[in-house]
């Protein structure tokens, strides 16, 4: 038979024995679990940016051991986002693996770092790797790149993703070393293509025992998979779940254009925010200004780019910020001639406390983008400028600690959440549409409504934000940050920040203020804010309703100087003054004539020298004012009566000795009447008042901003008492005629 025949004769019984043993269920011994200290994470980062620090923080959270290659080196691997490249990473891996090639029990995890976060720990990762029963496992992708012509060379897959993704792979050190030792290309050649060609070569794939993580048990590449993944809250933890394969990936990679989705997941994973514990990282790396002797220098950029209501209030609030004025510099761009008087009044106040003020007015004819570039550069060029705080004219900062709070959060870019009252409109977007515009993230409503509170990494913020000065002089050193393609300036800023890898945060940890609506702001009147009751009801109320109005319902401050004549505060001083100014500006007083074309029938039995609200287009505003602020008082003082809040006659009356000094006794054509004093007795006029004849009761010292409310057509016959000198103004409505 010869030696060969003898060996074959011995081998056949052994094979038969093995087959027999297998048929009896005799299995190989289960390999022991790989200890966590036998895992080494390797990544490449020639620079450190926000994405890198996020990756390292997630690794630290799970106690991964990480080795960073390429630190301090020049990146020569090309622009991987927009073209092929990345070969430098393979070259660095090749050099590093020479040190680990002989460690058979060491497992190497290579992963990107700028756009990766860990969602699970080393034990989970190693357990899933061992279950694959392969020496090297690559991330899998539904998209084939960079060479689609290689599709036919990939082995088929029954379930799962078919194509290799080089953003993450795990394997035993000797096998990883053998893999990268095959690299002999240039730094700017493509790493993805290199690994792809190794994998699709059947001999190399078998020799290195490579497989792909087809069902995303270890790696989740987000690009092309946005409809597969959701956020999962369970047992006090936050995870990313792949709903297609019912898996919980360990490493989440926001490859390609999916970085915004990764940023969204990064707000929660790993356990950055949970339903049970809220925000875990809100105070991470925060500072405390109460411990400093010298406050950081801040450039305050103020931008008025369109006619905006309530500007004096906006500007005054900036001066009430709880921050040392000697640490502030001021840059103001005002595009509107309409607001020049407001700016002048503001500067006259500010110049006593703020030493450096730069005003760029409408005469400069700067575009919004040019002005914003100039303001930001005002800080960038000053080495002493620690922060740039940009505030638009439509932001009402009601929290005086806003600036301090933002500085203490210690983020490169951070904005306070501000919203329009009663609406979901805010100064941030939680997601972007494919064309780069607004899309609503899953958590947007919860953040706006305060159901989820924290510090949120977002793709877009505007209106008000704080940027670190050192960031402007490093990552954001390009001066033309607000101009890009045909984008609006705010979108251009955010796009540039995203491309530079600078994270933008929004904070809703505090109540900071609100946004004003500039829609339908008509500047054709003298005091245009009077018309803002619909667009900006909160600001309208703050400016025009008496501060003591709420005490009507809490402290019972309503007075009753005559039977069923109720007296209560309603208007602020400013409301009274502006209403009088508006009427005098219009100037067409009726003259107290009986013949009056403004009313039905054309005849007034008891005429007054007046101007109707309808004449100055204030009728709808006034009726809304009655429904919102007069009707609740009516219900309190006339229990059981529910007013419709409607009036045909709403007008301002002017009494003076020269024109009309008094008004004869009469009943009003109303169920009840309101009569609001618009100026001060003793200061603006002498005399005047109202006498209710049935009760022989007079009120001769009306209070500015206070209203009488009394029944109309039946019981309360009354007259206007003579004005001796000066001019008296009252606002009157005959309600529910």
UniProtKB/Swiss-Prot annotation:
Cofactor(s) this protein requires: Fe(2+); L-ascorbate
Entries under Gene3D superfamilies matching the protein: q2cbj1_9rhob like domain, Spore Coat Polysaccharide Biosynthesis Protein SpsA, Chain A
Sequence positions bearing Phosphotyrosine: 323
Modified residues (Phosphothreonine): 320
The keyword rRNA-binding belongs to this UniProt entry's keyword annotation: no
Residue list for modification N6-succinyllysine: 704
Glycan attachment positions: 63, 209, 365, 522, 696, 725
Localization (cell): Rough endoplasmic reticulum membrane
Domain Fe2OG dioxygenase: 644-737
Cited InterPro entries: Collagen_mod_GT25 (IPR050757), IPNS-like_FE2OG_OXY (IPR044861), Nucleotide-diphossugar_trans (IPR029044), Oxoglu/Fe-dep_dioxygenase_dom (IPR005123), Pro_4_hyd_alph (IPR006620), Procol_lys_dOase (IPR001006)
Residues annotated for Fe cation binding in this entry: 666, 668, 718
Catalytic activity, EC: 1.14.11.4
Keywords: Dioxygenase, Endoplasmic reticulum, Glycoprotein, Iron, Membrane, Metal-binding, Oxidoreductase, Phosphoprotein, Signal, Vitamin C
Descriptive protein name: Procollagen-lysine,2-oxoglutarate 5-dioxygenase 2
Subunit structure: Homodimer.
Function in brief: Forms hydroxylysine residues in -Xaa-Lys-Gly- sequences in collagens. These hydroxylysines serve as sites of attachment for carbohydrate units and are essential for the stability of the intermolecular collagen cross-links.
Cleavable signal peptide: 1-25
Disulfide pattern: none
GO molecular function: iron ion binding; L-ascorbic acid binding; procollagen-lysine 5-dioxygenase activity
Catalytic residues identified in the record: 728
Catalytically driven reaction(s): L-lysyl-[collagen] + 2-oxoglutarate + O2 = (5R)-5-hydroxy-L-lysyl-[collagen] + succinate + CO2
Enzyme kind, highest EC tier: oxidoreductase
Gene Ontology terms describing biological process: cellular response to hormone stimulus; collagen fibril organization; hydroxylysine biosynthetic process; response to hypoxia
Keyword Acetylation found: no
GO cellular component: collagen-containing extracellular matrix; endoplasmic reticulum; extracellular space; Golgi apparatus; rough endoplasmic reticulum membrane
Pfam family, one: GT_PLOD
């Amino acid at each position: 038979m010869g030696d060969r025949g003898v060996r074959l004769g011995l081998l056949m019984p052994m094979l038969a024995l093995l087959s027999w043993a297998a048929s009896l269920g005799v299995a190989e011994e289960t390999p022991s679990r790989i200890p966590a200290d036998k895992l080494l994470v390797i990544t490449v980062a020639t620079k450190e940016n926000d994405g890198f620090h996020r990756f390292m923080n997630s690794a630290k959270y799970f106690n991964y051991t990480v080795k960073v290659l390429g630190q301090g080196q020049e990146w020569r691997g090309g622009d991987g986002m927009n073209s092929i490249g990345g070969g430098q990473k393979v070259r660095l891996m090749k050099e590093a693996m020479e040190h680990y090639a002989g460690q058979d029990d060491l497992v190497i995890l290579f992963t990107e770092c700028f756009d990766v976060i860990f969602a699970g720990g080393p034990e989970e990762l190693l357990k899933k790797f061992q279950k694959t029963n392969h020496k090297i496992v690559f991330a899998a992708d539904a998209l084939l790149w960079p060479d689609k012509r290689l599709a036919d060379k990939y082995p088929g897959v029954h379930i799962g993703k078919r194509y290799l993704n080089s953003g993450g792979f795990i394997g035993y050190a000797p096998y990883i070393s053998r893999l990268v030792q095959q690299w002999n290309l240039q730094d700017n050649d493509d790493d993805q293509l290199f690994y792809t060609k190794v994998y699709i070569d059947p001999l190399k794939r078998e020799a290195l025992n490579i497989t792909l993580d087809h069902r995303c048990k270890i790696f989740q590449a987000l690009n092309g998979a946005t409809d597969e993944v959701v956020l999962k809250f369970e047992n006090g933890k936050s995870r990313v779940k792949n709903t297609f394969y019912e898996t919980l990936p360990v490493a989440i990679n926001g490859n390609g254009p999916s970085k915004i989705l990764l940023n969204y997941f990064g707000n929660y994973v790993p356990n950055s925010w949970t339903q049970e514990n809220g925000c875990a990282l809100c105070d991470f790396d925060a500072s405390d200004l109460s411990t400093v002797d010298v406050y950081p220098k801040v450039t305050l950029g103020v931008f008025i780019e369109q006619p905006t209501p309530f500007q004096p209030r906006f500007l005054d609030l900036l001066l009430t910020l709880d921050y040392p004025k000697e640490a502030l510099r001021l840059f103001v761009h005002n595009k509107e001639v309409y607001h020049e008087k407001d700016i002048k009044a503001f500067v006259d106040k500010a110049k006593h406390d703020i030493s450096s003020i730069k005003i760029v007015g409408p005469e400069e004819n700067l575009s919004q983008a040019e002005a914003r570039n100039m303001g930001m550069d005002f800080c960038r060029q000053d080495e002493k400028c620690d922060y740039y705080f940009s505030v638009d004219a439509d932001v009402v900062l009601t929290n005086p600690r806003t600036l301090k709070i933002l500085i203490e959060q210690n983020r490169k870019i951070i904005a306070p959440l501000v919203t329009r009252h009663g609406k979901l409109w805010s100064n941030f977007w939680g997601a972007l549409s494919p064309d780069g515009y607004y899309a609503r993230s899953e958590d947007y409503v919860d953040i706006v409504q305060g159901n989820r509170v924290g510090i949120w990494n977002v793709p877009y913020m505007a209106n008000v934000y704080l940027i670190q000065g050192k960031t402007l002089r490093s990552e954001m050193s390009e001066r033309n940050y607000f101009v890009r393609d045909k984008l609006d300036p705010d979108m251009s800023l955010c796009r540039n920040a995203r491309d530079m890898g600078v994270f933008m945060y929004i904070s809703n940890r505090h109540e900071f203020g609100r946004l004003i609506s500039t829609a339908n702001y008509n500047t054709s009147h003298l005091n245009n804010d009077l018309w803002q009751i619909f667009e900006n009801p909160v600001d309208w109320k703050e400016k025009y309703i008496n501060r003591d109005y709420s005490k009507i319902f809490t402290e019972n401050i309503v007075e009753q100087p005559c039977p069923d004549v109720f007296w209560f505060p309603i208007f602020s001083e400013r409301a009274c003054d502006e209403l009088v100014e508006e009427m005098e500006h219009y100037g067409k007083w009726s003259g107290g004539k009986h013949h009056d074309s403004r009313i039905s029938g054309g005849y007034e039995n008891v005429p007054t020298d007046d101007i109707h609200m309808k004449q100055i287009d204030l009728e709808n505003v006034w009726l809304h004012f009655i429904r919102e602020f007069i009707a609740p008082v009516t219900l309190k003082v006339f229990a059981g009566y529910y007013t419709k809040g409607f009036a045909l006659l709403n007008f301002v009356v002017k009494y003076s000795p020269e024109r009309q000094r008094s008004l004869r006794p009469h009943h009003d054509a109303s169920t009840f009447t309101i009569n609001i004093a618009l100026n001060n007795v003793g200061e603006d006029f002498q005399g005047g008042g109202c006498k209710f004849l049935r009760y022989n009761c007079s009120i001769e010292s009306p209070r500015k901003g206070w209203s009488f409310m009394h029944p109309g057509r039946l019981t309360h016959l009354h007259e206007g008492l003579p004005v001796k000198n000066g001019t008296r103004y009252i606002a009157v409505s005959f309600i529910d005629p």
